[in-house]
């Protein structure tokens, strides 16, 4: 018996006891270093806490790649067949290819974009995200955008927010999701 055969039924039972069918569940995908080991982990966000449900050790240093990410997600997506899931990822997971793959799986996603990514505002008018005019204390939304000049993937919604400066707390940059 392997870990998945033991662990996944426990996860499925917990999901059934905790969430209603067809309920939206948020999953965070993240990579971390632990004692010179690289761990790719997927967690359920429940009551503002990330509960790990799957992890894999990567046999390398550095960032994960699309193949490793989709392999990990492929293992856990079937556990959520009765739910709507949204995958959340930071800048390591800002791949347009990952977004397309998630969309093909019927999975919603919020993936942080890099500030030097381009979006098409109008026909053939491209703008680097950092040049959209986002300033501390502001936010805006771009709907149905085409993302990245090289891949030109249509139909993305891009949310932009830069936290307001408050006393000693100043966010260094805005977020583009």
Q: Where are the model-predicted features located?
A:
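N-terminal accessory alpha/beta regions
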Residues: 1-4, 31
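Single, function-defining residue in the core of a domain
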Residues: 3-14, 20-25, 36, 46-177
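Acidic (Asp/Glu)-rich catalytic clusters
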Residues: 43
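An active-site-proximal beta-strand-loop segment
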Residues: 28-40
């Amino acid at each position: 018996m392997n870990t998945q055969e033991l662990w996944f039924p426990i996860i499925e039972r917990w999901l059934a006891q905790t969430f209603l069918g067809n309920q939206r569940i948020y999953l965070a995908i993240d990579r971390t270093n632990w004692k010179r080991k690289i761990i790719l982990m997927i967690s359920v966000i429940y009551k503002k806490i990330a509960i790990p449900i799957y992890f894999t050790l990567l046999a390398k240093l550095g960032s994960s790649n699309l193949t490793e990410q989709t392999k990990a997600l492929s293992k856990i997506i079937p556990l959520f067949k009765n739910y709507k899931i949204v995958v959340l990822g930071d800048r390591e997971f800002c791949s347009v290819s990952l977004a397309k793959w998630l969309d093909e799986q019927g999975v919603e996603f919020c993936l942080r974009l890099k500030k030097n990514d381009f979006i098409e505002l109008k026909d053939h008018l491209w703008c680097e995200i950092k040049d959209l005019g986002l300033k501390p204390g502001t936010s805006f939304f771009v709907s149905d955008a085409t993302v990245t000049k090289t891949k030109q993937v249509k139909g993305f919604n891009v949310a932009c927010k830069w936290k307001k400066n408050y006393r000693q707390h100043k966010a260094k940059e805005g977020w583009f999701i």
